[in-house]
């Protein structure tokens, strides 16, 4: 028996057929961090980065990326998302991004939440690279998912 969901018995890639699955409310939460120098963090916090507001465009980029996940990730289903939220928190040496994606559908939204975080953090890098080319994007991960056959899952703290 083949346990790989995206590979058929002949080894050919395929998109999983989710047509027979029940529609349920699904939520995924992802998180990641971008580390930077204190001066860079201060400039972003005060809105004085060379490109202006950094977090506004990063939030929009994350939302847009979640909506395009099916175009970016091979064999990922294109989804009609009900909601995507992208939030930022200043931490000691950087910015933490948390994205929540949700829908009522037949497949999960983990990849959409992860893509939102990834692109939001990449946008912060792009908007602030004139100040700090050594920024580090790290620890992008799924922290929670709810819904579907497997129910609720939470990452260990």
From Swiss-Prot:
- Keywords recorded for this protein, A-Z: Lyase, Molybdenum cofactor biosynthesis
* Molecular function GO labels: cyclic pyranopterin monophosphate synthase activity
InterPro entries, alphabetically? Answer: MoaC (IPR023045), MoaC_bact/euk (IPR047594), MoaC_sf (IPR036522), MoCo_biosynth_MoaA/MoaC (IPR050105), Mopterin_CF_biosynth-C_dom (IPR002820)
Q: What class of enzyme is it?
A: lyase
Q: Which residues form the active site?
A: 126
Reported EC number(s) for this entry are 4.6.1.17
RNA-binding is among the record's keywords: no
Q: Which chain positions lie within coiled-coil regions? A: none
Give the residues the record marks as binding substrate: 75-77, 111-112
Enumerate the Pfam families for this protein. Answer: MoaC
Disulfide bond positions: none
Classify the source by domain of life.
Answer: Bacteria
Q: Which reaction does it catalyse?
A: (8S)-3',8-cyclo-7,8-dihydroguanosine 5'-triphosphate = cyclic pyranopterin phosphate + diphosphate
For the biological process aspect of GO, one term held by this record is: Mo-molybdopterin cofactor biosynthetic process
In which pathway does this enzyme or protein participate? Cofactor biosynthesis; molybdopterin biosynthesis
Q: Subunit info?
A: Homohexamer; trimer of dimers.
Q: Which PANTHER family does its entry note?
A: CYCLIC PYRANOPTERIN MONOPHOSPHATE SYNTHASE, MOLYBDOPTERIN COFACTOR SYNTHESIS PROTEIN A
Q: What does the UniProt function comment say about this protein?
A: Catalyzes the conversion of (8S)-3',8-cyclo-7,8-dihydroguanosine 5'-triphosphate to cyclic pyranopterin monophosphate (cPMP).
HAMAP family from the UniProt entry: MoaC_B
Protein family per UniProt? Belongs to the MoaC family.
What is the protein's given name?
Answer: Cyclic pyranopterin monophosphate synthase
Q: Which organism is it from?
A: Novosphingobium aromaticivorans (strain ATCC 700278 / DSM 12444 / CCUG 56034 / CIP 105152 / NBRC 16084 / F199)
Gene name? moaC
């Amino acid at each position: 028996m083949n346990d790989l969901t995206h590979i058929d018995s002949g080894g050919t890639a395929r998109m999983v057929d989710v047509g027979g699955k029940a529609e349920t409310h699904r939520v995924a939460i992802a998180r990641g961090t971008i580390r930077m120098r204190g001066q860079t963090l201060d400039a972003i916090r005060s809105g004085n980065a060379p490109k202006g507001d950094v977090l506004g465009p990063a939030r929009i980029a994350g939302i847009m990326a979640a909506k395009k996940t099916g175009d970016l990730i091979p064999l990922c289903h294109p989804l009609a998302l009900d909601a995507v939220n992208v939030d930022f928190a200043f931490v000691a040496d950087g910015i933490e991004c948390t994205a929540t994606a949700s829908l009522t559908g037949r497949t999960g939204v983990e990849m959409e939440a992860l893509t939102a975080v990834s692109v939001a953090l990449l946008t912060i890098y792009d908007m602030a690279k004139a100040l700090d080319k050594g920024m580090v994007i790290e620890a992008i991960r799924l922290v929670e998912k709810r819904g579907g056959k497997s129910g609720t899952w939470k990452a260990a703290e």
